[in-house]
Regions:
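Extracellular/periplasmic carbohydrate-active domains that bind, remodel
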Residues: 1-246
Length: 246
């Protein structure tokens, strides 16, 4: 295929915008209940828009806690400058599921942002998405300063040795999960894995079997595991985003 024959297909959306702050969402509070409330508001509005031709949810300036959200067809989320969508870790809100890792069935938790079999979806704007990955991720000692390592040990004393370095784990559950590493597509494995919940870090943005996807302008930060995972998607446009683990 020659370059001049290739066309970038980006999603188009109905010219209807809904401001999150007008829908009953709460800004400035970073607790589990606020996150659940805001996620309900967002998910309800996504469903309503998708069922009525689509549109855009605008997240304005401010800090907005959330539990997992799911994008549906013909819906865009735009995060304005100085707007932060921060996902709050909670075992009840992020259940374990069987999904894929490098093409193989595996166990993870639900992702903060998911779209599956959706057509025309987008996350845009100059704001930020924070996946609270620092509550999930292991840390290798040689990647931090001595002072930072001391601070980590004050949070958790769960450390194991490798030939390369010491690795800090945020919880006992994640440490034991690393030793067990239960991976299977069987329901009984999913049940057994519950004892090692914190080990099964989610990807932050999970896009599965979607068509016409746009990610533009947003900073995706502090991811629990992989930052953005498009899996068997078509026409994915990534434009001027920042993706970082911290």
């Amino acid at each position: 295929m020659y370059r001049e024959d290739y066309k970038v297909t980006v999603p188009q959306f109905k010219r209807l915008e809904v401001l999150l702050s007008d829908c009953g969402a709460i800004s400035g509070k970073l607790d589990i209940e606020t996150g659940r409330h805001n996620a309900r508001v967002i998910n309800d509005k996504v469903k309503e828009l998708s069922e009525n031709g689509g549109g855009t949810i605008v997240i304005p300036k401010g800090i907005w806690a959330s539990a997992p959200i799911r994008l549906l067809s013909d819906v865009s989320i735009r995060i304005e400058s100085q707007g932060l969508l921060k996902f709050i870790k909670s075992k009840e809100d992020y259940p374990l599921i069987i999904t894929n890792y490098e093409g193989q069935p595996c166990i993870r938790t639900v992702s903060p942002i998911t779209a599956e079999n959706a057509v025309n979806v987008a996350i845009t704007g100059m704001g930020m998405v924070d996946g609270s990955g620092d509550e999930w991720r292991p840390v290798k000692k040689f990647k931090v300063t001595d002072k930072q390592w001391e601070q980590l040990l004050k949070k958790s004393d769960n450390v194991f040795e490798t030939k390369e370095t010491q690795i800090w784990m945020p919880t006992k559950s994640s440490l034991l999960g690393n030793e067990k590493n239960i991976q299977s597509d069987k329901d009984e494995a999913l049940e057994e894995a519950r004892d090692y919940y914190d080990f099964y870090r989610p990807v932050m943005v999970s896009l599965r079997h979607c068509t016409n996807v746009l990610l533009s302008g947003v900073t995706f930060m502090n991811s629990p595991a992989w930052n953005i995972h498009p899996f068997f998607c078509e026409n994915v446009t990534i434009d001027n985003i920042k993706a970082r683990m911290q």
